[in-house]
């Protein structure tokens, strides 16, 4: 992770690992295969993910494009950060404030 005065750059693999850990705590298993994210759960219905654009085969198994996954998990941060991403990294740029004061 690279932290600058007003931006944070996170390698995509680290970003996904962190998000997958959070999702696991909610009882949902997430896995990246190619450019798709596969979600599954034995006890949590994934209806909320379907409302957010996931393609669900049933209530417990969904898949969605990586871009949609990133949009979903970063939507709360968008009021404070400009969120940019590509296949290698996710960049958060502070909106009007510095993330690190030196």
UniProtKB/Swiss-Prot annotation:
The source's superkingdom equals Viruses
- Give the protein's recorded name: Uncharacterized protein ORF102
- Source organism per entry reads Acidianus filamentous virus 1 (isolate United States/Yellowstone) (AFV-1)
Instruction: Provide the organism lineage as a comma list.
Output: Viruses, Adnaviria, Zilligvirae, Taleaviricota, Tokiviricetes
């Amino acid at each position: 992770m690279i932290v600058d005065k007003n931006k944070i750059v996170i390698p995509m693999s680290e970003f996904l690992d962190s998000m997958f850990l959070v999702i696991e705590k909610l009882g949902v298993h997430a896995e990246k295969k190619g450019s798709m994210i596969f979600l599954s759960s034995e006890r949590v219905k994934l209806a909320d993910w379907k409302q957010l654009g996931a393609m669900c085969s049933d209530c417990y198994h969904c898949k969605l494009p990586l871009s949609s996954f990133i949009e979903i998990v970063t939507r709360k941060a968008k009021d404070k950060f400009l969120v940019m991403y590509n296949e290698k990294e996710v960049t958060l740029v502070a909106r009007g404030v510095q993330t690190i004061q030196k």
